Amino acid sequence: MARVTNHAAQRTKERLGISKRIADKNADKALQMGIKHSDTSGSLHRYISSLYWKQQAANNVRIYCDNVYIFHNDTLITVFPLPQKYRKTTSKIKKGRKS
């Protein structure tokens, strides 16, 4: 079960428009079903790597519903939207997983 920091709850409300209670459920889904760093390649992989190095406490970065979730173990630190240029790549990765 993912935990959500106060900062992450504030950011999910601000950036995604969802409440704290729903943010907990959303963080769980992102942790379980989100695209992992190891699933990516190319420029998306480099982008996720740069986020990993910028966030000192981060050790788990996931992409879920066109948003980037930064975790430390199972604690959500922050969330922000995925840049538009990477969204096609993530949809291809999702389709490849289902097959």
What does each model-found stretch correspond to?
Residues 1-99:
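Ribonuclease/tRNase effector modules and their secretory precursors
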